[in-house]
Amino acid sequence: MEWSEVEVHTTNEAVEPVANVLTEFGAAGVSIEDVADFLREREDKFGEIYALKREDYPEDGVIIKAYFLKTSEFVEQIPEIEQTLKNLTTFDIPLGKFQFVVNDVDDEEWATAWKKYYHPVQITDRITIVPSWESYTPSANEIIIELDPGMAFGTGTHPTTQLCIRALSDYLQPGDEVIDVGTGSGVLSIASAKLGAKSILATDLDEIATRAAEENITLNKTEHIITVKQNNLLQDINKTNVDIVVANILAEVILLFPEDVYRALKPGGIFIASGIIEDKAKVVEEALKNAGLIIEKIEQQGDWVAIISKRGVE
C-alpha cells in the first residue's frame, strides 16, 4: 500500500483544530512536533521519563503530520483539505506562517513515523499516560492511563489535557458523578474513572472521537463506569446535580454553554474548563461569572489556561 504524509506548519493554538480537520478527512494517524515540548523545563519531582531529540522538532511553531492511504479520492481531496485548514482563520484561529506539504511515504515509514512522538507522560506524581504499545512498570499506587492516540484526539501531551487532569486530581472525590464535554480520546473520562468517579457521561459531536473514546475506555477497562454519547455539548442532556463538568475545548466553544453547565452542576459542583489560550482567558472568565459561576482558581501552563469555577451553595 502507498501512503501520503500531509505536513502542516502552524501555531500551537491551531494544533487541535488542524488535527481534527485532518482526522475528519480520514487521516489514519497524526503526529504533533512542537518545539515547546523540547524546550519545556520539567520539574525534577516528576523525573525525566524519556529523552527528546532537538532535531525532531521545528525551529518555531508546530508541525502536524497526518497519514492518508494514497487513493484517487484522497488525491482529489488535497485542495479541499488545504482550503478547509485555511478557513480556520474565520474562527479567529491563528495559523501563523501556514505551510501545507504532501509527501509520499512507504508502509514502514507510516507504521513507525507517528509513533515515535508518543512516549509515557507523567502528569502528576500519581498519574502517568502510557501509549498502548509501550511496556511500562508502574510504581506503587501509580495510576496508569493507556491510550492509543492513532485517531489524534487528546494524547495527554498537550498542556490543556494536563491542566485538566491535574484539576481532576485536585477536585474529584470518590463517588462523584462527572460529565466530560468534548471527550476526544476519552482521556479525561478515563482519568476520572481511575480517580474514583462513580459514573461519567462522555460526550462529543464527532463520531470518530466517540469511537476512539470507546476503544480507549475499553482498553482501560472502565466501560462499566463511562457512558459515551455523540452529542453537541450539553444540548438535550438532562443530568443535573452533577459533581464535576470538565471541558477541554476551544475558548470560543466554552462561551456557548456556561449556562448549561450551571444547570447541570449541583450546588458546590465544579466546572473545569481548558483549551483556553491566554489572551482569551478573561473573556471566558467573564462568561462564567455571568452564568452564575464563581471562579475558584486559574492555572496556566505555557500559553494555555484552565479556569476552575463552581456553582455556589444555595
From Swiss-Prot:
Gene Ontology terms: biological process: methylation
Top-rank taxon: Bacteria
Gene Ontology CC terms, in alphabetical order: cytoplasm
Pfam family, one: PrmA
Molecular functions (GO terms): protein-lysine N-methyltransferase activity
Compartments (UniProt record): Cytoplasm
Keywords: Cytoplasm, Methyltransferase, S-adenosyl-L-methionine, Transferase
Amino-acid positions noted as binding S-adenosyl-L-methionine in the UniProt annotation, renumbered to this chain: T161, G182, D204, N248
EC number: 2.1.1.-
Family: Belongs to the methyltransferase superfamily. PrmA family.
HAMAP family, A to Z: Methyltr_PrmA (MF_00735)
Described purpose of this protein according to its UniProt entry: Methylates ribosomal protein L11.
Protein name according to UniProt: Ribosomal protein L11 methyltransferase
Organism: Listeria monocytogenes serotype 4a (strain HCC23)
